[in-house]
């Protein structure tokens, strides 16, 4: 089942522009991942492969800050704080997952097991389920 753009904006709490930025980052990441796995670019590290995701997170955080400040100035204080809290929580959990996965791939450490790496995603899924129930 596919979701409409309106439903995605409602459930994720991101603006359409932010979703576009993250999809563009996913496209660039996919190309870099294919280049890294095939070995076509010898000096490409895992940290360089994940740069599009890190950049998208940074741009999304910047955009969210601007939107929250504008909402706060317009008198929508409650909406501004809730939006800022929600988006920063989602981006923080996503960022922690990306950092842990990148560290595991780059260093092959035994201390990082995949249950620990994916735990931010499980927390994020629980939060999205709660938000989906609240929205509908």
UniProtKB/Swiss-Prot annotation:
Its main location: endoplasmic reticulum. GO terms for biological process: intracellular calcium ion homeostasis; spermatogenesis. It comes from the Eukaryota. Increased expression seen in T-lymphocytes from patients with systemic lupus erythematosus (SLE). Residues 1-51 are annotated as: Interaction with STING1. It is a multi-pass membrane protein. Keywords: Endoplasmic reticulum, Lysosome, Membrane, Transmembrane, Transmembrane helix. The chain crosses the membrane at residues 14-34, 50-72, 81-101, 112-132. It is found in: Endoplasmic reticulum membrane; Endoplasmic reticulum-Golgi intermediate compartment; Lysosome membrane. One of its GO terms (cellular component) is endoplasmic reticulum-Golgi intermediate compartment. Residues 52-136 are annotated as: Required for the lysosomal localization of the STING-TMEM203 complex. InterPro entries: TM_Fragile-X-F-assoc. Homodimer. Interacts with ATP2A2, ITPR3 and STIM1. Interacts with STING1 (via transmembrane domain). Involved in the regulation of cellular calcium homeotasis. Required for spermatogenesis. Acts as a regulator of STING-mediated inflammatory signaling in macrophages. Forms a complex with STING, promoting the activity of TBK1 kinase and the transcription factor IRF3, leading to activation of type I interferon expression. This is Transmembrane protein 203. It comes from Homo sapiens (Human).
